[in-house]
Amino acid sequence: MKINPYLPDGVYVPDGEPHLFEGRVYLYGSHDRFGGETFCMNDYVCYSADPSDLGSWRCEGVIYRREQDPRGKEGYLYAPDCAKGPDGRYYLYYSVSDSSVISVAVCASPAGKFEYLGDVTAEDGHVFGTGEEDPYLFDPAVLVEGTDVYLYSGSCPYRRFKETQIAYLRNHYGKNLRLFSRQMKSTHSVVMRLRSDMLSMRGTAKPLVPGAFAENPGTFSGHEFFEASSIRKFGDTYYFIYSSKLCHELCWAASSRPDEGFVYGGLLVSNAGRYDEERGRYETYCGNNHGSILETGRQYYVFYHRQTNRSSFSRQGCIEKIRMESGRFLPASLSSTQGETEGAGEYPAYSACILQYDGNAGFSASRAAEGRENHPYITQDGPDGVPGQYIANFRQGAKAVWRSFDLSGIREIAVTIRGSGVVRVGSGYAETDSGGWREVPVPFYENEENEIVITGEYGNVDILKIALREGGTA
């Protein structure tokens, strides 16, 4: 059975970079902490899967700890990427938060454990990213073709800040204010060529795709680069994947060359879901996004992440099938099942791909900041590392949707809930008045939809799981 998020209950690994190494798919990402105060507070872990079964992932354990980096005590390990070098070893590229430095760790195995190797340096020997005229470096991506090594990075502002926001950012950045100022001046993502030592630059960094304040964004207008660089090559075409200035969407651009000539292609996926033009709203809670594309078994998959716990700092990875036609990717829709069609079985409530209140959602972090106590959210009772996620605060006006399912033959949906209230499940109702979890079966009548919808009718309940059953009471 395949569900989203694709990693186990209670695992928070966003910024996913999937790579096919030695016959398995290895997943590299940052590592959030449940209830964390900022991004990426935990050490890197790696998961791997058989390429024919992206529903079953094996934890390879901690592959790199922040104290292994000389700057690790001052920050956290942001989104990494990994590549097999010309020498057959595996190189992990990453950046410690608020450093503007790309660092490298190395290992003989894609599953770790990695050891610190050094920092990427310019031709004059200085650590690139530390110079006053250097671009702001962030979210590295790496491509190795024979002895040619390309490194991609960058972060561009997606808006101009108000004075009150600038005051906050000055306080946040403190001694790194100069670093923040460089970031605010960035107009493009950048690409660099590295020598075979995987550390030393060959030549200078080149601008690659435009950010929001580039003089001429060209084909990228409306979807300019924000962050989250990733790179893939399919056939003879290079695909640059990135998060746009809208934050919640992953986009792609294509070129016949790895270091220039990229033209905007389109949207891959938005963690905000579908956009309602008439109402001017997206359909689920959203936030920043970062991921990439995997090709396996003649099928393409887009990896991305979503937000939980009314926060930007407890993110989880998701997968969707994605189609390519004539070299162009078509946008993926959000699903609970990695784009597969599932049937009878038991599904955790946190696999809901749509969550909203009164037809409204928005950025996840702002829901808590604005004190919107009526909004539902995904959370857990235990501390970080302990499974047990569920949908909390499901009140009148709340809505959860699970896609994509084959509901032919399903005659009952049992919902496990607690609290005091009533929810509507399809055309039936489930009621509880209990402090503990209680399973309530609800008759289900076949419809033409491929989704399950639960809405809050009154009271306040939590939802742990749903079970789709053939036969039953209908």
Predicted regions, residues:
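Carbohydrate-active catalytic/glycan-binding domains of CAZyme proteins
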Residues: 1-474
